[in-house]
């Protein structure tokens, strides 16, 4: 199994300053939500994977997303949900939901998925799986539920990264052997000289 490097999403949508997710630089994509409310989904996509990262014919083994975030306002109680975005739009596969008992007011990070987790997305198990992760539309839907029944919540996401685990395609090596035969012919020429003597 091989792994790509972590790569930042270059495109974000639906939150305030959504494209701030493209670097770990303390510039945040932000969302505010009332008590007991869901946020709109942050769409993180366009990770820039190429055939240099995931070769043609590779088998996708797992997908991971790493999110850096912090609480900007409100109390720490919340639940975050995530699902995978596919190239034809929308979301698909397992929803990754996790209870967050303390969204820190200092930046922290967490990882969704794993090296053998394909999020129950069937296309990743087909021959088109490598094309899918290289698509600019491939990515993550991420939203938050504010579990506090009284106070609003504001959250900032600094960056979203993706890493792909894969098995490289089998390679076929063809060896050509050329044999050269050299034949040497030796010709021997024998010359006979006859001398005749006449007596008178």
Give residue ranges: language-model regions:
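Disulfide-rich extracellular domains of secreted proteins
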Residues: 1-171
